[in-house]
């Protein structure tokens, strides 16, 4: 499974109303570190299919969501559960760091 495209228009439905925890990658086309983390985000979408929803939000085209959640630098990964932000990861970080943040959420799902 590939990451879904999150927009200002579908944010509430795809993220806030999701029955699964959601990892949202706030990114932009021109962002070098975003390109570095993109393959990791794709791997997580495949590996956690059915347990975690993974989405990507282009901040240039969806500024409303980025502003609402205080995203000031990219890449920023926000992890939502039950409609609330439960964790934040800023920057291109190694995959194990992201996994360590999402695994505990899956055990309580």
Predicted region positions:
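Non-catalytic, surface beta->alpha helical segment in thiol-disulfide oxidoreductase systems
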Residues: 79-109
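Conserved helix-turn-beta segment immediately C-terminal to the redox Cys motif
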Residues: 19-21, 38-57
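Short pre-active-site segment immediately N-terminal to redox-active cysteine/selenocysteine motifs
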Residues: 19-20, 26-30, 73
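Conserved Rossmann-like nucleotide-binding pocket used by diverse enzymes
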Residues: 2, 7, 27, 53-55
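Structural microenvironment flanking redox-active thiols in thiol-disulfide oxidoreductases
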Residues: 59-66
């Amino acid at each position: 499974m590939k990451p879904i495209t999150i927009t200002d228009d579908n944010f509430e439905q795809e993220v806030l109303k999701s029955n699964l925890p959601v990892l949202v990658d706030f990114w932009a086309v021109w962002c070098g570190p975003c390109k570095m983390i993109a393959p990791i985000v794709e791997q997580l979408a495949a590996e956690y299919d059915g347990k975690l929803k993974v989405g990507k939000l282009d901040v240039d085209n969806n500024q409303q969501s980025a502003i609402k959640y205080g995203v000031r630098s990219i890449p920023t990964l926000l992890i939502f559960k039950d409609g609330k932000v439960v964790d934040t990861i800023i920057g291109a970080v190694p995959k194990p760091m992201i996994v360590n943040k999402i695994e505990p959420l899956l055990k309580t799902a």
